[in-house]
């Protein structure tokens, strides 16, 4: 039976680039009706210990937490990230995949759909846990097998979701971010362009560190992740007549690619200058984004109509 479910799920799954938490990808690989407008237009406020002023490790971990590049196999192809199941550190109660979930907010993480090597032959969806206050725990995971947050994080990436072995810096960053998630009640807010652009500025601020330290590998890794987040925004401007907004976002992505290329060539002054220029452009974006916003998929009614159309 599990093999049949796996075959149906894989047959329905599009092959997507490993970019950000993909709106298009999520709508295509989830069965119709599984993903609600509510889940796509509202999320809990993040509320980090210490506010928005965080160390590089926390900011890099925050970016990685939202990047499908952390995962592998089906999850990465579908554009999923840690954020998909743990929105801003809370349990995503609307997450649901028929055949893998017993109810909204649950998922079978030991299924071949995610990792052939992790298949246990048992239908055992688990309730998605909140990561709030995780730094105070002495055991991790619903089975409490992991003795440290670092061990638990690695297991999720490698064993459950077939990701590549994370290096020490990446694990340090992911742990640092999770340890800043305060144990508070969820307060919901709209998913907004304003917040997404503010997040981009935070990612670009963090990117200044590897450029200042002249670390080309880390700079390239971060630019790939940030370009993915721009791709997420790009999907919200879905109409063909939004060429101005779409073109602007594509140009920002190209500028990041050039920064990575300059870093790879050791052109550090040029890379740092280009990053400063890009930060200024995003801090004061052209009016075209605001003009197109009422017709974008940030608007719940527009999104509802878009979801109801046949899968593209």
Set out the residue ranges of the language-model regions.
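Positively charged n-region of N-terminal signal peptides that target proteins for export
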Residues: 1-3
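Periplasmic c-type cytochrome electron-transfer domains
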Residues: 17-312
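Short alpha-helical "patches" and their helix-cap loops
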Residues: 5-7, 79
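Bacterial N-terminal signal peptides
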Residues: 7-15
């Amino acid at each position: 039976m599990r093999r049949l479910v796996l075959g149906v799920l894989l047959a329905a799954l599009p092959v997507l680039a490993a970019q950000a938490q993909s709106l298009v990808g999520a709508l295509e690989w989830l069965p119709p009706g599984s993903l609600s407008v509510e889940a796509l237009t509202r999320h809990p406020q993040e509320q980090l210990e210490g506010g928005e002023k965080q160390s590089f490790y926390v900011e890099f971990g925050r970016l990685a937490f939202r990047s499908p590049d952390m995962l592998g196999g089906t999850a990465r192809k579908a554009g999923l990230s840690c954020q998909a199941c743990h929105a801003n550190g809370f349990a995503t109660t609307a997450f649901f995949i028929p055949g893998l979930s017993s109810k909204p907010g649950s998922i079978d993480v030991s299924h071949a759909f995610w990792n052939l090597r992790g298949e246990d032959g048992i239908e055992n969806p688990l309730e998605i846990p909140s990561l709030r206050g995780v730094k105070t725990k002495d055991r991790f995971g619903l089975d409490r097998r992991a003795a440290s947050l670092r061990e638990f994080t690695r297991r999720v990436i490698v064993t459950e979701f077939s990701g590549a072995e994370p290096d020490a810096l990446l694990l340090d960053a992911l742990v640092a971010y999770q340890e800043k998630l305060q144990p508070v009640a969820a307060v919901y807010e709209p998913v907004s362009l304003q917040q997404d652009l503010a997040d981009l500025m935070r990612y670009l601020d963090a990117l200044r560190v590897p450029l200042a330290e002249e670390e080309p590998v880390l700079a390239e890794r971060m630019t790939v992740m940030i370009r993915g987040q721009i791709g997420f925004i790009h999907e919200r401007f879905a109409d063909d007549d939004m060429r101005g907004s779409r073109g602007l976002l594509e140009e920002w992505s190209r500028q990041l690619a050039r920064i990575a290329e300059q870093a790879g060539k050791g052109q550090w002054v040029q890379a740092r200058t280009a990053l400063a220029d890009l930060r200024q452009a995003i801090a004061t974006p052209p009016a075209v984004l605001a003009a197109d916003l009422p017709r974008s998929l940030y608007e719940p009614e527009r999104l509802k109509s878009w979801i109801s159309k046949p899968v593209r």
